[in-house]
Amino acid sequence: NWFPKFTPNSNQENQTDTPFYAISIPKINIKNATVSTIDTDLAKHLVNWQGTSIPGKNGNAVILGHSTLPQLFNAKDYKTIFANVYKLKNGDDIYTILNGITYTYKIFKIVVADPNDTSALEQNYDNSYLTLVTCTPPGTTWKRLIVKARLEKI
């Protein structure tokens, strides 16, 4: 596991003020899935990694989720929710709903990285970015699939 130690008390102010928000990815049948900024239990929800931004703010909101074999996908089971992330392409939309505001992100970069590569957590403050991270190939933990998106509209 390449993720740094998670300490809820060291979250950015933005995260503790917004403990949960929702994400929808229509192309892969994810609708209003819960994202937590204060807990790392990937069996209960997706996780917005501590120290990264949140949707609508400049910076990079990094969202982690479990994947598995695509045939086991269940949009209501957080142990399988990212099983079809590999189907996403540049130009696809991701929506986040935070404090009643919908933010539309458009995917612009998809890469596969080694498990010890933490570059997905890096912050860039020139815009609002969203990064999805899951294991790949589906059903393994060999590599990390990283899907980057940029805020298009509010």
Where are each of the predicted segments found?
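Solvent-exposed, non-transmembrane regions of membrane-associated and secreted proteins
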Residues: 1-154
